[in-house]
Amino acid sequence: VRVYKTVSFSVVILLIAVLFAGAVAVPAAAQSDAIQFHYNAQHAGDYSPVAGRNVSKGKLMWSFTTRSYVGSGPAVVNGVVYVGSDDHNVYALNATTGAELWSFTTRGYVGSSPAVVNGVVYVGSWDHSVYALNATTGAELWSFTTSGCVDSSPTFVNGVVYVGSLDHSVYALNATTGAFEWSFTTRGKVVSSPAVANGVVYVGSDDRNVYALNATSGAEVWTYTTGGQVFSSPAVANGVVYVGSDDSNVYALNATTGAKLWGFTTGYWVYSSPAVANGTVYVGSVDGNVYAIGNAAAATSQSATPGFDVMLALVGLVIAAYAVKTYRQ
């Protein structure tokens, strides 16, 4: 699936500006750590130090215009915004002014959200490659070529980069050298971004399955089959895997066994990647709603209808939603 955002990049920066309002959202101590899709390797999307900040005013600080759609989620580290664009570039921008610091050109769309760890930017491209770039200069450190487009966002854990590809595979790569460590082949495209917790990689595939894989060997630990394609990226919190499916459901699965704990049905496909904070699961649906789902057997929920298809990300208590159009490839 290719997801096209129908709003400008300046709107994305407006939402980032909300995080900066009144205080720096991510302290320097945290910024030296792994900053990646949905904040960390578990993809729960909850960064508690943001909670309680003054984020009531969404004042536009600046905007930066690329030459095409921006489907990549920005990563903000040490005063720099890293983001990809469908114009084939990865950009590094000054987080205060929006000035371009550098850009790196790939040979395809960059919808993958960068992971920035220890001075290295890891990102995928539709040119079939995963790139490691110097975070300061944008120089290429290494690249690894898969057999399909890479829309999945890389996840870094313990010196290994985990990422999916439209060639149906999940890859584990050495973060320093880019050397191949293992791959696991599903029966469909892997757009989902892997979540890693307690030595297990959790990822969805458009073969309708959610997979749990041994992070060291790639061996299958368990598989859970949903009723639709799984483009949603799993989130892991407190021993539970949360993930959406094209069957319109959000699932909570036991992280150890894969057993279904509960399911919550929305009105349409769930591409959105759930975020989990304070016992509540936040997720968007193509039915136009953003849902807050109580974690006790999904017994309680609230929804808000913004009037467009929803993709959602949550950091602390700040939710960012934006309109999307989709087509399947």
Residue ranges of model-derived segments:
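Secretory targeting signatures
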Residues: 1-37, 290, 295-329
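Extracytoplasmic/lumenal domain signature
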Residues: 25-71, 75-302
